[in-house]
Every structure is written in structure tokens, then in C-alpha cells.
């Protein structure tokens, strides 16, 4: 196992003996450097993309990586661009909140998002154009967002957060449902502990910065729809961005009071929520006669593809 690791996190990852080698970088953009690519090539490496890599590198940079990338590196452009993301989700017939074209069109509560994998930092809610402008200006002053940064406005969907993680195997042509998690965001979750009177006096724009994840087990009656959504997404991805949605991905949304799911995001690679199932998820325990984490599942797919000389099916 080779870990491409930011220098600031070296001390942490040196603690784990299963990591055979660390490639230290100041930024994941250095994956493109000849020295890094040479090391990966000499070890016949397959690069596993994650959220920080997507956040730090442009789509063009990711697509120019010469090391084989697990999954579909082309679909990461669709994850990073809000307009393209919405197009793919609609192609997959996922139920979605309506987008709002401009601040002038805000008629109800909306959530305003940044492009790419920002981890929720810089997101904010608004109920009118005036509210939007006030909060945007405040975040610019606080240097959380930049003045020329494009923002995406979407009607706010209320309900129980549920992040649905899947794995699609092109070797077996089969979709697997891995598990569900919830993300805990600061400081929006902490507001519930503050009395309403004090909340009204506060001028601070609440943040949606993701701090951690916790497991969730869905009602069994919801699982059939979960599989259908995952299968529809895989089919849509094959039509829209070849070779499709191979490997891990996540459909993110909420369940309302009628247990109806609304999806507001997707991630086309491994997500942090899979960390809570390092010893296997409840659903994977029904599919595999062994503990199976998402990392182990990816490694198993690479091993099987290598044995059958089909690495081209699982990498780009």
C-alpha cells in the first residue's frame, strides 16, 4: 500500500503499519509531477481518488493523470461542476430539489453551495435576495469564499440526512449497496442547543463544515428504492460519461416525513462516510462471508481484475 500524503499529515499516517510507503506532497497537484508519477509507475500502482484530491485539483489536471485511476476519472468533472452534476442526476431520474437560477428568484428557503468537494464549508441558507446578499458579503469579508466565486442555489430539502454508498463492479456487472451514514456539520447542528432568543440576536452565518460521520440503518421497506436509485444512476452514467460509474459512489439526500427521498448531491468516488464501516457494514455482511470495508472491496476488485487481465475495465 502506497499513500500519497500531504506533509502536514505525515505524523498521523506513520502510526499505521499497513502503509508500506508514503509519497509526501505539499498538495495533491504534485501527483502530476514526474517524480511522483515515476514512483507510482514503478510500483504498478492504481490511484484511488478521494474528496481532497477532487477539491485540490482541477478536472483537467485529474484527467491528465498518467497513473491508472480506479473508477472513472472523467465522471469526477461531473461531480465538481454543479450544472453537469444536476444534468446527470436528472438523467438518472433521481428526485431532486429545484435549482434557483439567481438570487432574485429566491421565493422560499434555499441552500447556497460552492462548486466541487468543499466539505460543506462556505455553504449557507437564505430566504430572500436580501438575505442571500447579506450572508454572501459576510462570508467574503471573513475570506471563507471569494468575491468572484460562482455559487449554486438550490431549494432547501428538509428531512433526515442519509448518505447512500454503493459499489458497482464492471467485472461482475453488479451493483452492491454498501451502507448509509449521516454527516455531522458544524456549527449548524449546535444551533439547536442555543435558545431561540439568543439565536435571533446572533449575526453569525452558520456553517455546514463536515466534522464527522455516524452509521445509519434504514428501514427494510426503503431498501428496494435505494437499489433502484443506484441502478438508475449506474445506467445513466454509462449513457452520459463512458465508461460509467465504476467502483464506489454515494447518493446524498434526505428522507421527508413521508419517507420520500430527495437527493441533492452525488460523489463519484470513495467518501469519508465509508470510514465508519472499517470492519464491514451491516449490508455487506449479507453479501460477503467475511468482514469487508470499502477499501478492502476496492483492493479485491483490483486483485480480481489483475488475475483476469481486465484492469482496463476498472481503471481510466
Spans of features found by a protein language model:
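Short internal beta-strands
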Residues: 1-7
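Active-site nucleotide/adenylate-binding loops and adjacent lid/helix of ATP-dependent enzymes
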Residues: 3, 74-160, 167-182, 219-231
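Conserved N-proximal alpha/beta basic substrate-recognition cap immediately N-terminal to
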Residues: 10-107, 118
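A short beta-strand motif that forms the metal-chelation/ATP-contact edge
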Residues: 109-113, 165-166, 259-270
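A short glycine-rich, hydrophobically flanked beta-strand micro-motif that places a catalytic Asp/Glu
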Residues: 154, 165, 241-258
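ATP-dependent carboxylate/phosphate-activation module, predominantly the ATP-grasp catalytic core
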Residues: 166-237, 267-295, 299
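Conserved active-site beta-strand-loop modules that form the wall/rim of enzyme catalytic pockets
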Residues: 173-176, 251-252, 259-265
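Cysteine/selenocysteine-centered motifs that mediate thiol-based redox chemistry or coordinate metal-sulfur cofactors
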Residues: 295-316
Amino acid at each position: 500500500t502506497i499513500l500519497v500524503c500531504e506533509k502536514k499529515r505525515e505524523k498521523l499516517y506513520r502510526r499505521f503499519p499497513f502503509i508500506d510507503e508514503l509519497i509526501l506532497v505539499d498538495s495533491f497537484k504534485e501527483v502530476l509531477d514526474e517524480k511522483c508519477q515515476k514512483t507510482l509507475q514503478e510500483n504498478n500502482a492504481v490511484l484511488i481518488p478521494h474528496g481532497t484530491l477532487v477539491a485540490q485539483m482541477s478536472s483537467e489536471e485529474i484527467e491528465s493523470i498518467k497513473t491508472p485511476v480506479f473508477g472513472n476519472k472523467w465522471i469526477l468533472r461531473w461531480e465538481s461542476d454543479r450544472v453537469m452534476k444536476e444534468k446527470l442526476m436528472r438523467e438518472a431520474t433521481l428526485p431532486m430539489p429545484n435549482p434557483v437560477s439567481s438570487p432574485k428568484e429566491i421565493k422560499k428557503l434555499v441552500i447556497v453551495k460552492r462548486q466541487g468537494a468543499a466539505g460543506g464549508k462556505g455553504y449557507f441558507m437564505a430566504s430572500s435576495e436580501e438575505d442571500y446578499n447579506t450572508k454572501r458579503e459576510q462570508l467574503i469579508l471573513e475570506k471563507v469564499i471569494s468575491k468572484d466565486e460562482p455559487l449554486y442555489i438550490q431549494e432547501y430539502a428538509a428531512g433526515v440526512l442519509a448518505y447512500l454508498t454503493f459499489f458497482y463492479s464492471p467485472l461482475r456487472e453488479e451493483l452492491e449497496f454498501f451502507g448509509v451514514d449521516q454527516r455531522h456539520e458544524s456549527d449548524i447542528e449546535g444551533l439547536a442547543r442555543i435558545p431561540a432568543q439568543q439565536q435571533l440576536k446572533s449575526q453569525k452565518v452558520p456553517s455546514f463544515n463536515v466534522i464527522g460521520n455516524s452509521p445509519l440503518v434504514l428501514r427494510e421497506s426503503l431498501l428496494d428504492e435505494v437499489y433502484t436509485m443506484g441502478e438508475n444512476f449506474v445506467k445513466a452514467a454509462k449513457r452520459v460519461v463512458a465508461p460509467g460509474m465504476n467502483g464506489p459512489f454515494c447518493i446524498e439526500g434526505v428522507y421527508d416525513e413521508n419517507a420520500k427521498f430527495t437527493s441533492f448531491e452525488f460523489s463519484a468516488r470513495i467518501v469519508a462516510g465509508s470510514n465508519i464501516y472499517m470492519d464491514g457494514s451491516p449490508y455487506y455482511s449479507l453479501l460477503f462471508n467475511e468482514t469487508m470495508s470499502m477499501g478492502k472491496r476496492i483492493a479485491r476488485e483490483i486483485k480480481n481484475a489483475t488475475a483476469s487481465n481486465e484492469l482496463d475495465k476498472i481503471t481510466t
